Amino acid sequence: MNPRRVVVTGMGALTPIGNTLPQFWDGLISGTSGANNITHFDASKFKTKFACEIKGYDPLNFFEKKEVRRYDKFAQYALVVAKEAIKDAKLGESKINNDKVGVIWGAGIGGLETFQNEVLNFSEGDGTPRFNPFFIPKMIPDIAPGLISIKYGFHGPNFATVSACASSANAIIDGLNYIRMGYSDIIVAGGSEAPITIAGMAGFNAMHALSTRNDDPLTASRPFDRDRDGFVLGEGAGALILEEYEHAKNREAKIYAEISGIGLSSDAYHMTAPHPDGKGAIKVMKNCLDDAKLNTSDIDLINMHGTSTSLGDIAETKAVKQVFQEDVYNLNINSTKSMTGHLLGASGAIEGISCILAMNNSMVPPTINHFNRDENIDPKLNLTFSKPQKKEINACLSNTFGFGGHNACIIFTKL
């Protein structure tokens, strides 16, 4: 029996290059860099003093003061994009069965700022534990889908996925599977992250994961460039309304794309480094193509994980060449992170949205900040450097990989 088909009928975005879905697309096509000096805290003594922050975000535009105190930023971001996606899908204008609507949400870390501030307050005291009663519920990753379901009365499957930078891609994959199996008709899937904190920046600096290009933050995220020196930390959220195809047709919903294939694998190699030959990445892309019943020649665009790290970019390009063989030279490749920075657990959702917008607008967003060719990367690959490229896109493959060796891959197609 063929599984139930799953389509995307609504989207929402809150990113360092745009605070709404249309603004995000404008930022992508304009080749906007979201990086700049950190304003969230005094980073003057930090090894890295810049990040990709959301600009102009005021929580009081979305929440009451009481809610702002009770919700960590990552949960606020989740509610903001869920609202945009639900409105975009016109769920409020349709008669739907809320028992068949679920929320599955990815976050690699969750309420990091809440955890950090509570522990700092305790350490500065006399040893008496005086913790905020909302400390635990503000911090846990699953509070984001919980709050979304509470706000909208969705009674279907509700949980968080935690797989580092692959978290929201896993949320989309789980959402698709719940619809395929008939547990749900609609899943609000996505991810959010707010890691630009003292602890977040210090922790990633201690790993030597971040770029330290403090003299030129705008160009610091430079995937596939010879002189890349680490990723740029970002923050934000993305939401997608996943819906069973016949259900969407029956309510005359706008359909952006179909999710045709999914893949999962593990490197089983190292805590943070990818396998140097990209073995896990090779496996996950092959699994995804098999699930979609597509050939490599059917793919028009690959949205790379492309973090701007020395090891990661080389391993991923090796894997893509191994999977796609000669077909790799007929498609476009890009890295959204060159503009948004690395949104960690929100990356998969935001980059999935980027793929869908690229298909709907027949335009490939660029990989910005390329200055010098890396001799370890095939110069014949079309990495969409510097400028967007007009292209008819019928199928887009999106890679998302996480610390721990978690690999997730999703193929979006036009109907």
Language-model segments: residues:
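Acyl-CoA/ACP chain-elongation machinery
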Residues: 183-229, 262-276, 306-313, 330-381
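Condensing-enzyme catalytic core mediating Claisen C-C bond formation in acyl metabolism
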Residues: 5-9, 36, 215-292, 300-301
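Short, well-ordered amphipathic alpha-helical segments that serve as non-catalytic structural scaffolds
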Residues: 78-89, 144, 171, 244, ...
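Conserved small-residue
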Residues: 10, 28, 82, 103, ...
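Conserved beta-ketoacyl condensing-enzyme motif
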Residues: 8, 25, 32-163, 192-201, ...
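Active-site-proximal alpha-helical scaffold in enzymes
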Residues: 78-91, 149-152, 158-193, 232-253, ...
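ACP-dependent fatty acid/polyketide chain-elongation machinery
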Residues: 1-67, 246-258, 353-368, 413-415
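Glycine-/small-residue-rich "gating" segment that lines the acyl/pantetheine channel
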Residues: 125-132, 173, 177, 193-250, ...
